[in-house]
Amino acid sequence: MFPEVRDLPSGIVDGQNYFAPIDWGDTTLFYMPDRVTWMNADNESFSLMEDPRVKGKVGILDSAADSLFLMMHHLGIDIREKDQLTKAAIDQGIAKFREMRDNGQIRAFFGDTSSMIEALGNEEIDVALGWNEIAWNAGAKMMQPANGTMTWACGLAIVKGADLDKAYAMINGATSAETSAYLLSEWGYGHSNKAGFSTLTADELAERGVAANPATHLSNGMFSVMPSDEVTDYMEAQWAEMVAGG
């Protein structure tokens, strides 16, 4: 297992590791290079989602913890610092999305990436805010701008009172070499188990937007933290209201 994801500070409490990391990747923008012809690796910017040339062609993942955080990052808020993730910062990000929604920039908020991939394929949208598998499954370019993508890791924790045999069986399966190879190959996500990486070539990893070592990947991204419970509840409520049209 890669120590860089095994030993993430957010998974360690009082010196004890409570987090079994599974997959890791990015929240970023994706664009269709044959339709967004002016964008390339040298000028990639999250400002693309506000570009009038893609008005009505932007798809946003309906997830405050992803889309709103990426917007705050775009607006210059340091999403790695908990003290910057305030209600005022949430309001700033929500206001920008509401502005984009009201001026017709956003085509739709999508509840899952499969729908976004389909929308990119049928030319309903040209730009999508989402996760790695969009690039792999839609033929879209995964944006990696100079100011960094938003990087994340997902994993499992055991709740108090759980059946430990069943919990460990699930964790062992989720962190296995077979799962690593599958997530890399079929979803384009990085994995905590090194074994899966040997099943893909360097070019295949690059095609999926995944570095061969998470240390490199995580250092090139913005690994966000969650705000306080109070701000998180506020964020989710404001996001739901905005997506619903309020």
Regions found by a protein language model. Give the residues of each.
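Periplasmic-binding protein-like
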Residues: 90-100, 136-162, 205-206
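A ligand-binding cleft/hinge motif common to bilobed small-molecule-binding domains
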Residues: 121-122, 126-141
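Mature extracytoplasmic/periplasmic domains
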Residues: 154, 159-223
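Conserved C-terminal helix/tail region of periplasmic/extracytoplasmic solute-binding proteins
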Residues: 215-246
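Extracytoplasmic ligand-binding site segments that recognize negatively charged/polar headgroups
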Residues: 1-115, 119
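Hydrophobic residues within well-ordered alpha-helices
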Residues: 118-121, 158
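Short secondary-structure boundary segments
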Residues: 61-62, 132-133, 187
